[in-house]
Amino acid sequence: MARLRRRLWAWLLAGFLTIAALTLYQAERTGRSEPVAGSCPESALECPGEEKPLPLPVPVEPSASPSASASPSPSATPASPSPTPPPGSSAPPPSSAPGPACNATSPGACGFPDSRSTGPRIALKRHDTGNMSIKTDGTVIKGWDIYGSLDVYADNVTIIDSRITSTNWWGVNLRPGFKGLRVLHTTITAVPGKGPDNGGVNYAVSNMGESSVEVGWCDVSVFGNALSMGQGDLHDNYVHDIVAFRNLGGEWQHTDAVISGGGNKGRLTVRHNTLLNSVPIDKGASAALGLFADTGVVSNVIVDNNWLAGGAYALYGGGPGATGILVTDNVFSTQYHPKSGLYGAVAAWNAGGAGNVWRGNRMSDGRPVVPEPSP
């Protein structure tokens, strides 16, 4: 009898322990027995039970490959560039609606290139090259602090993340018959009074040939006709502090931040640059951007989303006979003159030219810019 009682108590105890174990197991699974969690540490990348915040947009710095065969990152462009109307069609009339105003003296604050977004991004090593000729295809110059100039007799030459201080006619020059020159993230300047044109210097980048030259994210100063070419891709550059000089003929040299003389064999694209010409009119200032029919008819040019200031007129638009000229969404700053240029924002605009488009251009205070009728 005693043995039976002991067995009964043993079974009861075993059952009780089994029930308790099952209860604890269930509590562990449901979390009811977990202690209250402490606050998530600030160093944690993500806290349990919290929704991830949406990522903030991060600006991506454009970069270029140091290899001559790789293409550099393209410049930021509008999502839908303006289409070119077919020849003979009527371009839409210029908009008269005001645009947003911006500080006339701060292109960088308004989203345009300045000293902070242009020039080399790496440490430089000094190279006293003098006036050096490049004759090897695919040459890459990177991280050089050059005292001299570069005369290019080769294809697919890349100059990137460098600085050029010239006392020659140019900083970089592409000779006829060669192609593929790219000048990126480079400061190009000169020593005033030390150039060959009676102390003056003329071209930061010159294209003597018929192929396109790319100049992007460059900080350019001093040169009288800073970026000079018939065809090319000029984007995200900061051209400023042009220095006036009397040339070998004894006359004040005409100055322009960008100049093209017409007769071009390919497209010239001038997009998202800051182009400043602070030279006084009586000392030679022509334009911030001059499209002149000096050597032939001006055609096939895109002028889009630039900041322009200075000159007699800030923009010369190609003159009679100019065709395929798209001038869109540019800001004409009053930094030097109330009208952007001394006499106005634009001259020599051929409104009736086939494929010519004028749209979305405004003063820095938001007023629309409408060209004067052609004479």
Predicted segments, located by residue:
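Secretory targeting and sorting signals
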Residues: 3-27, 79
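Right-handed parallel beta-helix
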Residues: 138-145, 156-166, 178-192, 209-222, ...
